[in-house]
């Protein structure tokens, strides 16, 4: 009897658990390893909460098989062989110009190439009807996808998934504000142009112009994406931007403690640090041995994958190795590309440096002997460093990296160093490194950032899981969607009111002004003649 009772209890517990388990699709195109890892963490957290998760990895770059993106969820892998090379070429092109300052036209051109290549891959994926039918049969309750390209949201709508969640994988960019018709704070946040801590008039103007131009560009590219979906699913298929504007929740994969403080939305939830393992301290003996070197500690150097050390100007790494020699009391760990033979060869004669194409970054960041992290300011690395309390020297190259580096500088736990310094002015970069190693305020502020993040009333996992379950359970939360999300740019910024008022004001000012000038001119030219006639 007791056995039967125990079995019934187990069955009831199983049924109760099953009721709250949802079928969820995580849409994860392979745009880079860091994005695969970020989406893998989202999938794992949903699975850890008891949900049935399908992690759909579309291999845009041929990197899915070698990237450990998820630990708990089995990956569903889709190949896109036709458009893969075109997408690779675009990213390779970014690597080749990473040391340049592209300006507005370069920014526009780069975005057009990226979105065109992505849209072509999206179109190729849409033609895989067998995969579509297989996914449609699973009757998903929820859908997650990033903001880099909004192809996934059109796909989710076609699958009939009504609860859709937008993941902003980097700080809230101006075009994501534009999705919701939420005015972006161009005066204070450097979205698409560099701005000093106290922005000048020119910096604010450039940021506004670049942001507005990019918003218009994305609207145009999204129109083309909608055309692709209507060709596939019929002319009555809604526009993809409209689908995105009605996403239930925007999950920001960033931390508000790290980012610029800026206006937010009722359906925007920060989940920075989700899935980051703060207990990752174990490392292989070879790396443990390296961490013991250096009388005053260890310095980590990694520029990510876009600023590839095998494709950027050789002088960059040669200059850095020259700086390494001037700090003999510190041991340097350098992550260099596996094809970068030049850096590895030049490092052989330097006693205080270790070069590898892979380093256990999370474990190194949590090691007590690490003094600073020199990074390109990619967000995954920033979150890991923030949670470890490690001060940063950032060398931003492109994308969200400048925005990230300025936020770190603003909050006092890092130094922003211009990418041209290692190329043209290594002495200035050396001065930045000396400042970091001799000024304890950076470490103090990094520890404060760490403590603020870890002591927040509600952690990233609780925010993420509870919000997701709450939304699906209640059939969406339209009550949180912004009222102005369907407005045009003209209505959203009240241009239809402001412009006519300005014209009226100008008219009221200009007409009297010209009358005054005309009267003055007339009097100066003819007044003396009229006066003479009167005297006569």
Curated annotation (Swiss-Prot):
Keywords: Glycoprotein, Glycosyltransferase, Membrane, Signal, Transferase, Transmembrane, Transmembrane helix. The chain crosses the membrane at residues 497-517. Gene3D superfamilies: Glycogen Phosphorylase B (3.40.50.2000). Its EC number is 2.4.1.17. The keyword Ribosomal protein does not apply. Residues 1-21 form the signal peptide. The keyword NAD does not apply. It is a single-pass membrane protein. Glycans are attached at residues 52, 308. It is an enzyme of class 2 (transferase). Its main location: membrane. Pfam families: UDPGT. GO terms for cellular component: membrane. It is found in: Membrane. InterPro entries: UDP-glycosyltransferase, UDP_glucos_trans. It comes from the Eukaryota. It catalyses: glucuronate acceptor + UDP-alpha-D-glucuronate = acceptor beta-D-glucuronoside + UDP + H(+). One of its GO terms (molecular function) is glucuronosyltransferase activity. PANTHER family: EG:EG0003.4 PROTEIN-RELATED, UDP-GLUCURONOSYLTRANSFERASE UGT-47-RELATED. This is Putative UDP-glucuronosyltransferase ugt-47.
């Amino acid at each position: 009897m007791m056995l039967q009772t125990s079995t019934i209890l187990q069955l009831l517990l199983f049924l109760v658990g099953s009721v709250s388990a949802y079928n969820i699709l995580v849409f994860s195109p392979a745009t880079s390893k860091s994005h695969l890892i970020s989406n893998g963490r989202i999938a794992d957290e949903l699975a850890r909460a008891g949900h049935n998760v399908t992690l759909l990895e579309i291999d845009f770059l041929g990197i899915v098989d070698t990237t450990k993106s998820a630990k708990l969820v089995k990956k569903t892998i889709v190949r896109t062989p036709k458009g893969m090379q075109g997408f690779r070429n675009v990213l390779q092109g970014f690597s080749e110009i990473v040391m340049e300052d592209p300006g507005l036209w370069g920014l526009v051109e780069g975005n057009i190439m990226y979105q065109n290549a992505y849209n072509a891959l999206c179109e190729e994926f849409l033609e895989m009807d067998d995969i579509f039918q297989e996914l449609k049969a699973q009757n998903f309750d929820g859908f997650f996808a990033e903001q880099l390209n909004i192809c996934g949201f059109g796909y989710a709508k076609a699958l009939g998934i009504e609860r859709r969640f937008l993941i902003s994988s980097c700080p809230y960019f101006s075009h994501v504000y534009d999705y919701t018709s939420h005015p972006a704070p161009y005066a204070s946040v450097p979205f698409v142009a560099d701005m000093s801590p106290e922005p000048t008039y020119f910096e604010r103007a450039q940021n506004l112009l670049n942001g507005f131009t990019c918003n218009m560009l994305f609207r145009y590219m999204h129109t083309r994406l909608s055309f692709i979906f209507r060709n596939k699913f019929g002319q009555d298929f809604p526009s993809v931007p409209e689908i995105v504007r009605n996403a239930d929740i925007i999950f920001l994969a960033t931390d508000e403690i790290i980012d610029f403080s800026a206006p937010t939305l009722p359906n925007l939830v920060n989940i920075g640090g989700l899935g980051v393992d703060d207990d990752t301290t174990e490392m292989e003996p070879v790396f443990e041995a390296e961490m013991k070197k250096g009388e005053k500690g260890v310095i980590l150097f990694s520029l990510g994958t876009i600023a590839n050390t095998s494709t950027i100007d050789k002088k960059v790494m040669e200059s850095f190795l020259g700086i390494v020699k001037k700090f003999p009391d510190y041991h340097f760990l350098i992550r260099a590309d596996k094809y970068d033979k030049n850096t590895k060869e030049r490092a052989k004669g330097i006693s205080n440096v270790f070069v590898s194409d892979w380093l256990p970054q999370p474990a190194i960041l949590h090691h007590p002997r690490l003094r600073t992290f020199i990074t390109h300011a990619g967000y995954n690395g920033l979150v890991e460093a923030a949670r470890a309390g490690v001060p940063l020297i950032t060398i931003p190259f492109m994308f969200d990296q400048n925005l990230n580096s300025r936020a770190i500088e603003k909050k006092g736990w890092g130094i922003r160093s211009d990418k041209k310094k290692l190329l043209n002015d290594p002495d200035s970069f050396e001065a930045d490194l000396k400042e970091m190693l001799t000024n304890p305020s950076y470490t103090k502020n990094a520890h404060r950032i760490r403590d603020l993040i870890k002591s927040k009333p509600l952690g990233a996992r609780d925010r993420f899981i509870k919000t997701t379950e709450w939304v699906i359970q209640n059939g969406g939360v339209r009550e949180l969607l912004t009222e102005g999300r369907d407005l045009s740019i003209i209505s959203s910024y009240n241009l239809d009111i402001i412009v006519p008022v300005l014209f009226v004001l100008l008219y009221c000012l200009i007409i009297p002004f010209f009358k005054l000038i005309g009267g003055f001119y007339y009097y100066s030219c003819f007044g003396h003649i009229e006066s003479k006639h009167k005297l006569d």
